[in-house]
Amino acid sequence: ETTDLHMNLLSYDYYQDKTTDQYGLARAIALIKAARAEAPNSLLFDNGDLLQGNPMGDFVAKVSPLKDGQTHPAYRVMNQLGYDAANIGNHEFNYGLDFLRRSLKGANFPYVNANIYVADEHRNSDQARHAFTPYVLLDRQLVDAQGKTHAIKVGVIGFAPPQIMLWDKGHLEGKVIARDVLETARKYVPLMRAQ
């Protein structure tokens, strides 16, 4: 799992203007490949807070915004690594919903969020519409120690803190609402298990 990459794709500290060995997805690539070689029955997830966090993120969002059909640089790398699924983190909302949705189109893996809903006339009812896919069930084949293949389903669900409605009010107010994480999990986890 990766989390809180904050657009640190390269092993570079933009604030110090020098390379670093402390962070960066480029640095993690070797670790991910080694882990997969050691445990071929593995899955790769990202927990969010990917698109914002350093000058590269600002550049992609504000200076040279994505055009239709362009893939966000983070997703170019993640697609190559074969991520299985990802969660939308609170910082994904920092540049607004249009940028987020345009960026997500470039991901070749599912993104989930169960507690953010469209702010329409149904927002406070059971007919409320999700702003994003609430969860996915991944069908995977695993090989046991004897070489036998087993089909399994892996449920992936994601949440964002409801505080995004305060933190990114200018981008989100009147467009989406956030529901309680625990309440949402109690609703969807049993549904996922039943499938």
How would you name each of these model-derived features?
Residues 1-195:
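Acidic, metal/ion-coordinating pockets
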